[in-house]
């Protein structure tokens, strides 16, 4: 059993614990996007820390540079890759104050079985509406064990972004893995205040 949490408005980071034994939890990993110093910090299960500069070559598996304020509660869900089911954490990249386009407007999928390394980052489109898009809301997950209507293995995820757009994100064995499909657009502007901060229900 894995517990994963972020710092909310307090930072741009997440950590994960193995709480299979509640009285003896084990640290799994943590990562932080330091936007002030333009650095990525990553801690593995042994507590070893890596410090990676934006200016150097950051491999995709450690590229958390789009992580904003960590509002999004991670969805721990099954994903099908190469006909194998694996458990991952998926979350939106968080809040950017509505003004900074450098981070926040993405969805992350990370490997819970390999120190939280990034499996995929998918960026959300930013339209011309005077809002710097981001995704502070948590994702909604629909899994095969949660509904008899599901004819797939893995998970479908749904998320709203700050600009009022709704997206479907595919982590199933049907269609294209990591496919991101727009399903609704509220056409948010600063004037109409249709911005989305919360999880869809």
Region spans (language model):
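A fold-level detector for beta-propeller and closely related beta-sheet-rich head/sensor domains
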Residues: 1-201
């Amino acid at each position: 059993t894995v517990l994963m949490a972020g710092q909310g408005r307090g930072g741009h980071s997440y950590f994960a614990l193995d709480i299979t034994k509640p009285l003896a939890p084990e640290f799994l990993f943590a990562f932080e996007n330091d936007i002030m110093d333009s650095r990525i910090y990553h801690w593995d299960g042994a507590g070893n820390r890596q410090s990676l500069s934006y200016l150097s070559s950051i491999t995709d598996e450690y590229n958390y540079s789009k992580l904003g304020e960590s509002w999004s509660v991670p969805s721990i869900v099954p994903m099908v890759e190469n006909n194998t089911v694996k458990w991952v954490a998926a979350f939106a990249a968080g809040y950017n104050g509505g003004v900074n386009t450098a981070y926040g407007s993405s969805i992350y999928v990370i490997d819970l079985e390999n120190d939280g390394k990034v499996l995929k980052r998918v960026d959300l489109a930013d339209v011309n509406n005077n809002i710097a898009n981001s995704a502070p809301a948590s994702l909604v997950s629909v899994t095969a064990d949660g509904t008899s209507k599901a004819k797939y293995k893995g998970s479908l995820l749904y998320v709203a972004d700050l600009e009022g757009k709704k997206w479907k994100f595919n982590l199933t064995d049907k269609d294209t893995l990591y496919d991101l499909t727009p399903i609704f657009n509220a056409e948010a502007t600063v004037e109409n205040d249709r911005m989305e901060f919360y999880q869809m229900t």
